[in-house]
């Protein structure tokens, strides 16, 4: 099984508390994802996330095909870090860690994604032909939105 990594970081001119409130709310997903994604939360989500919280979504990720996604907040260290992991969805494995670090003039946002594709070599081919570029597009859209809203400095890498 091939494991893929996607890492992004940005400096944002906002407070740690404001950053936590924004990034820990799944209701902001449509603000920071491309229009084609159409994320709809299908479960009740409390005001504050916590470890063990399960959140279900519907989205249109590839070719407008609707898909269900169930994620669990596996770790939550308010206001610095949370991790959500796919429990049901298109990936064999998906983990997205969001880290917020206070700095002199705002915060450092780090997105650390680790994922694996299903279907063995076919999944690897699909990743190289479609999924990796879609993920880049999703996080480019996120970067651009954040940059326009909070003057972000950008660093990205895909492994």
What do the predicted segments below correspond to?
Residues 41-88, 141-149, 153-158:
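Glycine-rich portal/gate segments that line the openings of hydrophobic small-molecule binding cavities
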Residues 86-137:
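Beta-strand/loop substructures that line and gate deep hydrophobic ligand-binding cavities in soluble
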Residues 1-50:
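Hydrophobic ligand-binding cavity/cleft-lining segments
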Residues 15-16, 74-81, 99-108:
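A short, structured loop/turn motif at beta-sheet edges
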Residues 12-14, 61-63, 75, 90, ...:
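Beta-strand elements of well-folded, non-transmembrane domains
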